[in-house]
Amino acid sequence: SSDLDGTAYLFWRRRMAARMTDDWQHLTGDTIVMSTARQGYSEGPVMFKRKGIYYYIYTLRGNQNYVNAYMMSRQSPLSGFEKPEGNDIFLFSSIANNVWGPGHGNVFYNEETDDYIFVYLEYGDGGTTRQVYANRMEFNEDGTIKTLVPDEKGVGYLAVSQEQRENKALKASFSASSVRSPRTSKVEIETQPNCPLADKTSLVKVERTHIYHPGNAGDQSNGTRWMAETNDDHPWLMVDLGEAMQVTECQFAFVHPAEGHAWHLEKSNDGTNWQPCAEVKEVKACSPHVATVGDKVRYLRLHIDKGAAGLWEWKIY
């Protein structure tokens, strides 16, 4: 983070903070521990300034009870922080919206329009999904942050969408070599993290089930995915467009993209006779992977040769 005078600061886990040199290459001065109203392990801090107030956001707990709390200061990025009036934990799980454990993230803002967006991860199940969420922040007249209820609506495009083509996958049908069995998670969520009830009645038992149906790859939702069975040695996902139509390219958003994938794509007009279409032979880490088709086809079949056997999204243009 940098202040209006150009001074840069670094904030990191366990509430550590320090001033940086002008070239942003080194720390300078003393390393301090940020003062917070609540204790406990914390990581992924955020510092930003709005209307003369410095905000220090820090995380607490974890798993399904991951939360974000904050402190306020009118002095400097490293001093004068006090607990805000009212609830200092402003973001926590929403059972109604099916968002569990909203964790650390960052604030993006436009000072001219006073638009502030908090982008964060969801703990999800087992800490392995960690999908990215975004919600708009709102403030009270005194500068305190209003409680942010997490949801899957997002904030929409902040500019005109660069993609104007029709996604043919939305009207297609999907099938697969196998489908992973549904996974049900049962947890207890603290519904009043700012002031938990002593009798623990604010702890609510909830459960949710993830279904890995092939059609999830074509619903244009980054919250659902297709997964093959763990013992599927040759996983594939096939799409039927209903009739032969011109396809320019396909975009694949694989599960665990940072681990990389190798794959090959086939095309067909009868679902029986297949021809090679595109491939990535060596494991490549990126998202999305793009396959050039440039042909009139009805069926497409994606074989995952290496990498996690799952797909968040398959877009077809």
Question: Model-found features: residue ranges?
Answer:
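Beta-rich carbohydrate-recognition and catalytic domains
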Residues: 1-40, 49-54, 59-96, 111-113, ...
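Beta-propeller and closely related beta-sheet repeat lectin domains
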Residues: 43-46, 103-106, 289
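Short, conserved beta-strand segments of beta-strand-rich sandwich/propeller modules, principally
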Residues: 115, 249, 297-301
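Extracellular beta-strand elements of beta-rich domains used
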Residues: 137, 241, 250, 314-316
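Disordered, acidic Ser/Thr/Pro-rich linker "stalks" and the adjacent N-terminal cap
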Residues: 157-243, 255-258, 279, 285, ...
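Trp- and acidic/polar-enriched beta-sheet ligand-binding modules for extracellular glycan
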Residues: 231-233, 257-317
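A short beta-strand element within beta-rich, extracytoplasmic domains
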Residues: 245-257, 302
